[in-house]
């Protein structure tokens, strides 16, 4: 007994739609990882920060930096070594840092006037 072609095509279409939506191996925007869960890249986490532990090779979802905490804006293989700052803070680097070295800064709150000065001068 042979299935009609249109029924076979319909079955294949539903099968591929299932694979594209629910059969996905990476988390979707509705299936993001929570804090302290193991992650592979920043996009997997709710916070947007997948941080690699300095003492081992494990990485986990971490909170973004609060005022005074260590921060970094460079991404290494889809992960941070220190999470970037929260939305209302800026990562400020020391002036004596080398350009090519791995630079860590501190999260600080900056007034709008200082930002405007930095942008134009």
UniProtKB/Swiss-Prot annotation:
Disulfide bonds join 39-50, 45-61, 49-83, 71-91, 85-107. It comes from the Eukaryota. It is found in: Secreted. The keyword DNA damage does not apply. Exclusively expressed in epididymis, in the corpus region. InterPro entries: Colipase. Keywords: Disulfide bond, Secreted, Signal. GO terms for biological process: digestion; lipid catabolic process; response to food. Gene3D superfamilies: Lipase, subunit A (2.10.80.10). Residues 1-23 form the signal peptide. PROSITE patterns: COLIPASE_2. The keyword Secreted applies. GO terms for cellular component: extracellular region. GO terms for molecular function: enzyme activator activity. SMART domains: COLIPASE. Belongs to the colipase family. This is Colipase-like protein 1. The lineage of its organism: Eukaryota, Metazoa, Chordata, Craniata, Vertebrata. The gene is CLPSL1.
């Amino acid at each position: 007994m042979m299935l009609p072609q249109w029924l076979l095509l319909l079955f294949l279409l539903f099968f591929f739609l299932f694979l594209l939506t629910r059969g996905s191996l990476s988390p979707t925007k509705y299936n993001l990882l929570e804090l302290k869960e193991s992650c592979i890249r920043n996009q997997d986490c709710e916070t947007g920060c997948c941080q690699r532990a300095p003492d081992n090779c494990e990485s986990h979802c971490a909170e973004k930096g609060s005022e005074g905490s260590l921060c970094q804006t460079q991404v290494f293989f889809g992960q941070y070594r220190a999470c970037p700052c929260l939305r209302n803070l800026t990562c400020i680097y020391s002036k004596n840092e080398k350009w090519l070295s791995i630079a860590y800064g501190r999260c600080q709150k900056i007034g709008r006037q200082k930002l405007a000065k930095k942008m134009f001068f």
